[in-house]
Design a protein with these regions (language model features):
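Beta-strand segments within the central parallel beta-sheet cores of soluble alpha/beta enzyme folds
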Residues: 8-14, 38-42, 121-128, 145-149, ...
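Active-site pocket-lining segment
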Residues: 106-109, 150, 218-294
Length: 341
């Protein structure tokens, strides 16, 4: 990448909003006079999340490693039981909130019940995500850098289904609440690998390196919420941005709300209607180039991807302001406002 060796790097972490956190961290460092140009972004390889041994198995392996003679090793080996080798799925552990004990899909099921969001509405939203992503392939191709896997270039998102429909999605079975649930593999975000890189800097830094800025960061907010209803996180985050800078969603020409689950986004839209003037958002205004249901949700990268997509939409459409928001596993929300330069 041509970054000089003396330039340090650091990792930030805010679950689903980690990519956005990297952007706002750069902004904070610039405000503190710690630099004027930062390479930021996020990456996630969800296909390579490991399996784990149960906690008790690790202790038995440690005992085996400490054994000093053959008899000690035999005793350590004899302590193992078949259950010790039953793997724990790392992805499932990572997507389970330790406070509520709920896996993320169960939080979406909770919202679907509380807001009366039926299976048909979720599947219709999911099918629209694929349809919009397919229609926008030409617009987004310039923001994709090809990667090579086994010598083959991948230059387009491979999760988009050109034949997705409400009828096909209706054939899928619920995966969290298997008896009465409505959340399926088709109306939630895809498990995906992905990475995003952006430059965040001052106008002077952009001029110095000969680049034209895509836009300006004008506000951002992170807010907490009930972990069992983490999907509603965008609502308090947007409200905090209003309190800080007077910005309300209806001012945005472009709006991106991450599609962790169709039920979650629809619940956010329903809750925003209760927030007062300027907060109601029509469904057709959000995620006009598709969302994570079609494109995937590589957790560490999505926040930065949404910002990049929103900036490009502003420049393609001639809009002035964009609002980007995500729910965050563990009970948070993130909202970030951009302005076209």
């Amino acid at each position: 990448a041509g970054v000089p060796i003396p330039v340090p790097a650091a990792t930030v972490h805010r679950n689903c909003a980690s990519g956005m956190e990297s952007i706002t961290t750069a902004h904070q460092r610039m405000a503190a006079g710690k630099g004027d140009l930062f390479l930021v972004g996020g990456t996630e390889s969800m296909s390579r999340v490991p399996l784990f041994y149960p906690h008790g198995t690790n202790a038995k392996f440690n005992a085996l490693g400490r054994a000093k003679d053959m008899m000690g090793k035999l005793r350590a080996v004899a302590a193992f039981r078949p259950i010790d080798f039953k793997p724990e799925i790392g992805l499932q552990l990572g997507l389970t909130d330790p406070v509520s004990g709920m896996i993320m899909g169960d939080t979406a099921e909770l919202l679907s019940r509380e807001y009366g969001i039926d299976r048909g509405a979720q599947d219709a939203f999911a099918a629209a995500s694929h349809r919009k992503a397919l229609a926008a392939r030409e617009q987004v191709k310039d923001e994709i850098t090809p990667v090579f896997v086994d010598g083959k270039a991948i230059s387009a998102d491979n999760g988009i289904r050109d034949d997705s429909s409400v009828e096909k999605l209706a054939e899928l079975k619920p995966i969290f609440d298997r008896q009465t649930g409505t959340v399926t593999a088709g109306n939630r975000s895809q498990i995906t690998d992905g990475a995003v890189a952006l430059l965040v800097g001052s106008e002077e830094a952009a001029k110095r390196i000969g680049l034209e800025p895509l836009g300006r960061l004008i506000s951002y907010a992170y807010a907490g919420c009930d972990p069992s209803r983490m999907g509603l996180g965008p609502v308090p985050a947007m409200e905090l941005a209003r309190q800080q800078d007077g910005l309300v969603p209806e001012e945005a020409d472009v709006i991106e709300i991450n599609e962790a689950f169709a039920a979650q986004v629809l619940a956010v839209l329903a809750e925003l209607k209760k927030q007062g003037p300027g907060f109601a958002i029509p469904e057709e205004k959000i995620n006009r180039w598709g969302g994570s249901i079609a494109l995937g949700h590589p957790v560490g990268a999505t926040g930065a991807r949404l910002v990049l997509t929103a900036l490009n939409q502003l420049n393609v459409t001639g809009g002035r302001k964009a609002l980007v928001s995500l729910c965050v596993g563990g009970g948070q929300g993130a909202a970030l406002w951009l302005e076209r330069t």
